[in-house]
Amino acid sequence: MKAARFVMRSARSLSSAGLVPREVEHFSRYSPSPLSMKQLLDFGSENACERTSSAFLRQELPVRLANILKEIDILPDRLVNTSSVQLVKSWYIQSLMELVEFHERSPDDQKVLSDFVDTLITVRNRHHNVVPTMAQGIIEYKDSCTVDPVTNQNLQYFLDRFYMNRISTRMLMNQHILIFSDSQTGNPSHIGSIDPNCNVAAVVQDAFECSRMLCDQYYLTSPELKLTQVNGKFPGEPIHIVYVPSHLHHMLFELFKNAMRATVEHQENEPSLTPVEVTVVLGKEDLTIKISDRGGGVPLRITDRLFSYMYSTAPTPVMDNSRNAPLAGFGYGLPISRLYAKYFQGDLHLYSLSGYGTDAIIYLKALSSESVEKLPVFNKSAFKHYQMSIEADDWCIPSKEPKNLAKEKVAV
């Protein structure tokens, strides 16, 4: 316990002083090792070896943490020095230092393996509020100065990589904890957090019902679901893939919330609401899920902003002293959902018809061998990206905001 408190104090003092432990420098020289869904399944198979998994994670997790810590350090000083970002940085340093301690302990000792699981649980819990805390840091930074286009571009680049890094480390920790922890809390049909036979329609239905419950509570009404399945590989059979149901649920829940809100608000004077239509198609390479609504759509000029961390129409949430800030209000739903899709080489796109509705499409890999982690690595290319400037546009482009015609002078 004393050692843990010492590590925590050391991490915070190093972070606040702008210093980087030599362990961060050491592990940042290595590139992360992406795993495929198939490899993750093999790690958790019936013949799974806890020692092998532990040996991999005690090396891989510090590498992933160190790589993203190096990127935090090249962000604007005013952002890095905010209390929120300093707190996140101290969490990452503390977690890295705790994991590195296991390099000095025997991997053949069962007590060490048990302690490693406990440490992973501690790290996972410590990082629980990383997303809202970093988001609060961005808000503090935006409130303190004007964010120029170059910085805005760099922050979008960084946050995509930072949150993808978090998704990946959380995935690895959850797999090991669920498979090797003494407390069996996972689904018995799953391997860790992965369902080898994920029923896509069932996840769609569950995410829809969760969203519908919120919609009913807020609007006292909600649209129905119209679900269509097309199995191009095995016609007529239900669609199953190897995937992480919680990741898919996260994406669908966010998209359904948006679709329902738009539908109810756009059709508030209609006698009935048009259903949200979902089409699930399994092809040879991809699983595609299309969510279509008749919620009026959004203008083209706004579509790109929907995936921006720096743009949100929601009121800014207030964090309490315990740092327990809600995600709602940060406007991170869509960009984080797209990262979940991209994590295993998929994607998420929005196609909107202003005045009619929106199609949201999730693309996932159909084969587990092709579902490979998409991981950020801190190298010369990444460093150069933060040094790039935006060249002057060589096209004459009008303002992206619509003109207020009431203020325009009428030409005589």
Curated annotation (Swiss-Prot):
Its EC number is 2.7.11.2. The keyword ATP-binding applies. The record marks 157, 161, 395 as: Interaction with the other subunit in the homodimer. Coiled coil: none annotated. InterPro entries: AK/P_DHK_N_sf, BCDHK/PDK_N, BCKD/PDK, HATPase_C_sf, His_kinase_dom. PROSITE patterns: HIS_KIN. Residues 138-368 form the Histidine kinase domain. It catalyses: L-seryl-[pyruvate dehydrogenase E1 alpha subunit] + ATP = O-phospho-L-seryl-[pyruvate dehydrogenase E1 alpha subunit] + ADP + H(+). Keywords: ATP-binding, Hibernation, Kinase, Mitochondrion, Nucleotide-binding, Transferase, Transit peptide. GO terms for biological process: cellular response to fatty acid; cellular response to starvation; hibernation; insulin receptor signaling pathway; reactive oxygen species metabolic process; regulation of acetyl-CoA biosynthetic process from pyruvate; regulation of fatty acid biosynthetic process; regulation of glucose metabolic process. Detected in heart, white adipose tissue and muscle. GO terms for molecular function: ATP binding; pyruvate dehydrogenase (acetyl-transferring) kinase activity. It is found in: Mitochondrion matrix. GO terms for cellular component: mitochondrial matrix. Belongs to the PDK/BCKDK protein kinase family. Kinase that plays a key role in regulation of glucose and fatty acid metabolism and homeostasis via phosphorylation of the pyruvate dehydrogenase subunits PDHA1 and PDHA2. This inhibits pyruvate dehydrogenase activity, and thereby regulates metabolite flux through the tricarboxylic acid cycle, down-regulates aerobic respiration and inhibits the formation of acetyl-coenzyme A from pyruvate. Inhibition of pyruvate dehydrogenase decreases glucose utilization and increases fat metabolism in response to prolonged fasting and starvation. PANTHER family: [PYRUVATE DEHYDROGENASE (ACETYL-TRANSFERRING)] KINASE ISOZYME 4, MITOCHONDRIAL, PYRUVATE DEHYDROGENASE KINASE. This is [Pyruvate dehydrogenase (acetyl-transferring)] kinase isozyme 4, mitochondrial. It comes from Rhinolophus ferrumequinum. The lineage of its organism: Eukaryota, Metazoa, Chordata, Craniata, Vertebrata.
